[in-house]
């Protein structure tokens, strides 16, 4: 498999893991109070996304890191929009909850965040570059799948704190 294809698949895996892990972390606070959930989303999620962006960018093997940033940003936005539809529309049946101002703010911020991370951490990203390994895929993939399954169980069985 070509290195770029592996890197794109890695990005998809990381974004999948971050999205579902983030929703799992926010589920209970959000179910108690929407404003609490939104507040936590706007404070905790940037750190989680930043962690994932960093892991994607240090594994980018292209000459121009900016190209990797653009690709990563597009992947993150597309997966977030599709995953939001799956989570709010298909799993929860709550499309009205999806289209809130905070959602669109989140999409814009997520798109810009990759560029901000490159601007702030470019030297560190270039210094920490490392190859993609099967372990990289497995760890993020397992976390994402486990988070998704737990979240589905919580919602379908109406588990409360």
Question: Where do the language-model regions lie?
Answer:
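Membrane-helix boundary connector in multi-pass membrane proteins
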Residues: 89-99, 118-135
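Hydrophobic cores of alpha-helical transmembrane segments in multi-pass inner/ER membrane proteins
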Residues: 45-55, 106-121
């Amino acid at each position: 498999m070509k290195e770029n294809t592996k890197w794109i698949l890695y990005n998809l895996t990381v974004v999948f893991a971050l999205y579902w892990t983030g929703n799992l972390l926010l589920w209970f606070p959000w179910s108690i109070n929407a404003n609490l959930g939104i507040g936590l989303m706007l404070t905790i999620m940037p750190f989680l996304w930043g962690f994932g962006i960093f892991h994607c960018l240090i594994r980018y093997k292209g000459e121009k890191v900016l190209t990797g940033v653009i690709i990563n940003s597009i992947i993150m936005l597309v997966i977030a929009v599709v995953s939001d539809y799956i989570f709010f529309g298909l799993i929860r049946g709550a499309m009205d909850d999806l289209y809130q101002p905070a959602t669109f703010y989140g999409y814009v911020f997520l798109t810009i965040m990759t560029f901000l991370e490159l601007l702030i951490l470019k030297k560190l990203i270039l210094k920490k570059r490392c190859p993609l390994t099967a372990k990289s895929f497995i760890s993020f993939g397992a976390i994402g799948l486990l988070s998704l399954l737990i979240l589905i169980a919580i919602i379908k069985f109406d588990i409360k704190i």
